[in-house]
Amino acid sequence: NAIDNVAFLNADIFNNEVEDNFFDFVWCSGVLHHTKDSKKGFEIISRWVKEDGLIIIGVYNKIGRLRTNFRQAIYKLLRKSVFAMKLISMLDPHLRKNLSHEKKLAWFRDQYDHPVERKHSIDEVMNWFEENNISYLGSIPNSSFEFKTVSQMSGYKGTYLARVFAQILMLFSNLGGEGGLCIIVGKKNNAFK
């Protein structure tokens, strides 16, 4: 049963194989922070979104990723040995779950063996949004400290201090324990406003 109004794309963002204003909705999670230039990657994919379309990105958070960064340092300090893999498997909350060997290996490679990794703050991504004609709708975590679905997000930014505190709280939640991924949601503005 094919869906004729959905397009999935697996390509190099920097080849920019998509025409501008093509998608109503762009979801790019777990990608930009593994590219040669996260901001440039965002600039490219933001052009793909139609006016009034939504864009959701998931990037590693500078603060929320600190626990993972600590485990990464241990893994590298122990020279990525078999012992290091076993130790990290005990320390990483996601790897302690009852997962298949394949899923554990995929998680391990993504979290500990990826050659390129960048981390970004919510404010940094909010600046990307502003520079690319995208209105900030919300994020997970957010400065109101309440979970909101995309349809409930109102663009409330809160204060800088509240945004920083929300990111610090990632260290004490499942968000920080499982990789420190931060979700940021925006809406493409009308070019003539």
Annotated model-derived regions:
Residues H101-K193:
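Rossmann-like AdoMet/SAM-dependent catalytic core
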Residues V6, F22-D24, N133:
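Local beta-strand N-terminus motif with an aromatic residue
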Residues L32, Y60-R65, P141-N142:
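Short "lid" loop at the C-terminus of a central beta-strand within the Rossmann-like core
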Residues F14-V26:
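A short acidic, Gly/Pro-enriched loop at the edge of an enzyme's catalytic core
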Residues A2-N15:
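Conserved SAM-binding strand-loop segment of SAM-dependent methyltransferases
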Residues K39-E51:
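A short glycine-rich, Lys/Arg-flanked "PGG" loop and its adjoining helix->strand segment in the class I
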Residues L54-H94:
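Conserved class I S-adenosyl-L-methionine
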Residues D24-S38, N61:
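A short SAM/SAH-binding and catalytic strip from SAM-dependent methyltransferases
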